[in-house]
A protein has these predicted regions:
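A short, histidine- and acid-enriched strand-loop-helix "catalytic/donor-clamping" loop
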Residues: 117-120, 125, 163-171
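A short helix->loop->beta-strand "cap" motif at the edges of active sites that frequently abuts
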Residues: 154-156
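Single conserved hydrophobic/aromatic residue that forms the stacking wall/gate
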Residues: 175-183
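A conserved catalytic-core segment of Leloir-type glycosyltransferases
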Residues: 43-122
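Polytopic membrane enzymes that build or remodel cell-surface glycoconjugates and lipids
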Residues: 137-141, 164
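Short His-centered aromatic/hydrophobic patch
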Residues: 132-136
Length: 183
């Protein structure tokens, strides 16, 4: 089975709690069991330089965010027999902390959309996209609205796991509205 595991944090690259522990271990267990499980996380500025040195550039593209398109760099690395992908945008992710910013809704709306945009660039058609917590909750929504009708994206299923119900990512609807180009 081909699984894309989407999380806002994953050990050893970036973490602030239990999600990082799960995202850093569950995909590796699935890989050891013979599944093609790949992980995607933001390329935060807080990732240690020695881990950044192991990353390889794939490409860059733009991601629709509300009324504009934002730069997205895409990197990959192997760690413990799993492939990691890193979504790069310094405006959104080169900060001193993972969360707690005024624009977290926009940052993770961008991340969710970038996950879907990156798939053809890595030539990976997952059977399942496993989303974790509010930071990736828009992936299934964006898939249904903007990608499910495109032949390359047919038949991708999604799974959503809540790790901590206390953090719900409640923000203004403005950040989830489609751009005029998407309507």
């Amino acid at each position: 089975m081909r699984i894309l595991y989407c999380a806002s944090e994953a050990n050893p690259f970036c973490g602030s709690g239990g999600l990082a522990d799960v995202a850093g271990s569950l995909p590796h267990t699935l890989c050891r069991k013979g599944q093609d499980c790949r992980i995607v996380v933001p390329l935060y500025g807080t990732i240690p330089q020695e881990l950044k040195n192991s990353m390889n550039f794939i490409t860059n593209f733009t991601v629709p965010v509300a009324w504009r398109h934002q730069y997205c760099g895409l990197f990959w690395a192997r760690w413990n027999d799993c492939t990691y992908y890193f979504i790069d945008n310094e405006y959104y992710f080169k900060r001193g902390t993972l969360y707690g910013h005024y624009d977290d809704a926009e940052r993770f709306a961008f991340f969710s959309r970038a996950i879907l945009e990156m798939l053809p660039y890595i030539d990976f058609h997952p059977d399942i996209i496993h989303c974790n917590d509010w930071q990736t909750a828009l992936v299934p929504v964006y898939y249904y609205l903007f990608y499910s009708h495109r032949p390359w994206y047919y038949n991708i299923k999604s799974l959503f796991t809540i790790h901590n119900i206390q953090y719900q990512g409640e923000y203004c609807l403005l950040y989830t509205s489609p751009s005029p180009r998407d309507s």
